Amino acid sequence: MVDCGVDIYQLPVVPRACRSPRGRRLKIMRKQRSEFEVLAQVAGRFSGERKNRIVIGSLAHETKETKDDNVVVNNFLETMEVEVKPQPGLENLSQVLLSKDWLALGPSMPNSPITQEENFDSRSKIDSKRKVSHLKERGSCISQESQNMYPLKKRKLFYQNHSSESHDTPCTVKFGIKSLNISELLVDVPESATVGSLKLAVLEAVTQILKGGLNIGVLFQGKTIVDDSKTLLQIGIPYDDDDDENLGSLGFMLEPQKSETTTITTFTTVSPRTRLRQNQVLGSVDSTEAVAAKSVVPVRMKPAWQPEMVQRRIRRPFTVSEVEALVQAVERLGTGRWRDVKSHAFNHVNHRTYVDLKDKWKTLVHTAKISARQRRGEPVPQDLLDRVLAAHAFWSDRTG
């Protein structure tokens, strides 16, 4: 425990696991209950003795003895102190002394009130002041001790939460536009034109679009945002969004002003016409009509080695004649010479590679080993499957 009242060297705090406050509450409640039970027993005992003495005094008319007994009891009660701890929520803590009127409790004197003794003893006043000051000092240390009882990780989170609440910094959203792309730009130049004249022609075409003035429109998830007073958070772009889906769905449009129309100057054309398609340009330029709205959306650049159009191979199952030709070639050349099998049996078949032939042979061996009910795909005659097993066993023994 850390003594908050004395300024001495304090040992380093060792992180502990959080303790449940339920056990401490039960201990406090039991202690308070036991103190109140002792107080009630003392009050009942003295009230019973008082009743007996009142009855005896009324019968024997011995007023002198009863007065002496009262003096003794009152002196005993004045010197007895009972410390009562308040319930949770009460702030004023003090000591309560049993009054003389406690002897009057009972059915014989119901109207007598319970009053607090006003004339405190000097010793009781000093003790009560010390105890109250000690309790106040202990109350000031409760917050520090409760923080020390947290584990180290929870304590760090505790300080981070308080620091984040105290310093409210504005959150920002970062956007990066790598390139402004137009879908397609058609430029007609003669074959004898130089690279410099080609650059000049493209520059004039783009300048003709931009010189008339542009308006910027915002697109989010394919919808145009008309209200300029909306915030990014209202649109649906939070600042702490780690996913790039929202940022990728945000686009900008370059729109020419409605009051002006731009036209493109006609370049000198010589047949054959050369059509240049730029990869970094999306949109079209018309020589006679008004310029339409151009959408500006960041596009990921493809690597130089990756082709623009990758044709997907069409899966073509092997026919029975192709399977028979494959079996004949393997029987003659073996299972380890697939390039020779390709050049010997499938030389004029461009859609069959030697890897396809190797995979098909493995499939035929597996199909021949399983039962007819488990086979799938185009059925293969059983005599061909028998030849596959025989050739596979022959070349396996020879190569092994």
From Swiss-Prot:
Assembly and oligomerization: Homodimer.
Domain HTH myb-type, first and last residues per copy: 310-369
One Gene Ontology molecular-function label: telomeric DNA binding
Function according to Swiss-Prot or TrEMBL: Binds specifically to the plant telomeric double-stranded DNA sequences. At least 4 repeats of telomeric sequences are required for binding.
Coiled-coil region list: none
Record has Transcription regulation as a keyword: yes
Xref: InterPro entries: Homeodomain-like_sf (IPR009057), Myb_dom (IPR017930), SANT/Myb (IPR001005), TRP_plant (IPR031105), Ubiquitin-like_domsf (IPR029071)
Species in which this protein is naturally found: Arabidopsis thaliana
Protein origin, superkingdom: Eukaryota
DNA-binding region range list: 338-365
UniProt protein name: Telomere repeat-binding protein 6
Cellular component per GO, a single term: nucleus
Primary gene name: TRP6
Gene knockout outcome: No visible phenotype, probably due to redundancy.
Alphabetical UniProt keywords: DNA-binding, Nucleus, Transcription, Transcription regulation
Domain Ubiquitin-like residues, every copy: 173-252
Subcellular location: Nucleus
